[in-house]
Amino acid sequence: MDIRPSEISKILKEQIKNFDQKAEVSEIGWVLSVGDGIARVYGLDNVQAGEMVSFSNGVRGMALNLEIDNVGVVIFGSDRDIREGDCVKRLGAIVEVPVGPALLGRVVDALGNPIDGKGPLKATEYRRVDVKAPGIIPRQSVHEPMSTGLKAIDALIPIGRGQRELVIGDRQTGKTAILLDAFLNQKPFHEKDAGNEKDKVYCIYVAIGQKRSTVAQFVKVLEERGALEYSIIVAATASDPAPMQFIAPLAGCAMGEYFRDNGQHALIGYDDLSKQAVAYRQMSLLLRRPPGREAYPGDVFYLHSRLLERAAKLNAENGSGSLTALPVIETQANDVSAYIPTNVISITDGQIFLETNLFYQGIRPAVNVGLSVSRVGSAAQIKAMKQVAGSIKGELAQYREMAAFAQFGSDLDASTQRLLNRGARLTELLKQPQFSPLKTEEQVVVIFAGVNGYLDALAVADVGRFEQGLLTLLRSDHSDLLQAIADQKQLTDDIKDKLIVVLNTYAKNFS
């Protein structure tokens, strides 16, 4: 075999030229003990609170407890393949998730990894999950309506863009249904020509500790009704570890803040925060933090307040964007005075209180109008809605008061009887089937008919039929009237006169 020295020297020179001695320095530690989704790690002396770490099998974790001789790490994933003595690396980054329009229409887990089988995300931007809420100066008071399409809510407990409105009630009272209807109600704004960017509301649904079948059902409804294209679903289901359920709302909020900070509008539903509190309690107890009331850690109030304070309406200098939050809390046997419910009630700007017995009476959405409030109030309504909703609030309040007394006496004077009849019909009018949100102008017309006595002569059972017929008539023959209310945002004398003519004719012919 012929060896050519020139060739050998050429190969050696080539290899020397390409030799690049890169040393990777990473700070490491070792697992002392692991179990229940928590690892105790020795080493990692310079790790920061909330920093991501990586175990030797690729699972990520987050350093939460920084003690003198060890670090308490919560594991974002299964702890089955982590052993005592395994190597743990610092990643030098706080927990981040992908954000931006690339996530719309997708289902992701709490760390932003897609779980819907539609391939990888095309997101280019990442954000920290736990950031400080905007201060006082960049904010503006809530003044634009965030319509849910539900008469009972938009008329009596209005929600504004940038508000935090709690949806609270027992299990199976229709809490998720309210979120779903609010999401579906944003569809018309996305159908119009793209010039109307300021009306578009992007929706984020965070499922915490729910059954996978429930989340799949939610996604299916959004998909069938064409609402998935402007929604993001963040799912940390019941089978996910507690740290994932704890971080999911923060991740969803970071995704919503992207829209808020870019001058757009977003609506986020946390379903539900009681399960996040339970997951946080589990983590805290396993990390040996001292328990407080109901064994929750002392900072569970701070956990929820720093999350919900991130929902805000920003002023014009900061782009006029908004993030509206609808946190859900599940109560046990209507006990609103438990620890987590009272905490979240005191943080939010009002609550929608749903009751089991109303639900079983067929009053759906099962909103208890007496206990529900919106602390933003009529600032979050257009003038047309204020004009008709003011009187319905008063009449329903009087009706509730009278109905309690009327149970005892049978001989009621005519005015009381009239009040009870009107109240029963208005209550019937506020009922609404699921998946059928109404536009604001349609709600205005329906409530106008109710408070002006057009329902008084009807049997209670006919109210729903009357409403359906009226809406069908308006949509087909008087769409200009609806459009006028939508454009002028108030009931001018001219619109009122036209409306009364239509209602008189319709009521006369209704049988």
UniProtKB/Swiss-Prot annotation:
Membrane topology recorded in Swiss-Prot or TrEMBL: Peripheral membrane protein
Subcellular location: Cell inner membrane
Catalytic activity: ATP + H2O + 4 H(+)(in) = ADP + phosphate + 5 H(+)(out)
MF (Gene Ontology): ADP binding; ATP binding; proton-transporting ATP synthase activity, rotational mechanism
Required for activity (site feature) positions: S372
Keyword Nucleotide-binding (UniProt): yes
Residues binding ATP: G169, D170, R171, Q172, T173, G174, K175, T176
Family to which this protein belongs: Belongs to the ATPase alpha/beta chains family.
Quaternary state and interactors: F-type ATPases have 2 components, CF(1) - the catalytic core - and CF(0) - the membrane proton channel. CF(1) has five subunits: alpha(3), beta(3), gamma(1), delta(1), epsilon(1). CF(0) has three main subunits: a(1), b(2) and c(9-12). The alpha and beta chains form an alternating ring which encloses part of the gamma chain. CF(1) is attached to CF(0) by a central stalk formed by the gamma and epsilon chains, while a peripheral stalk is formed by the delta and b chains.
Purpose: Produces ATP from ADP in the presence of a proton gradient across the membrane. The alpha chain is a regulatory subunit.
Protein name, per record: ATP synthase subunit alpha
Organism: Bartonella henselae (strain ATCC 49882 / DSM 28221 / CCUG 30454 / Houston 1) (Rochalimaea henselae)
Gene: atpA
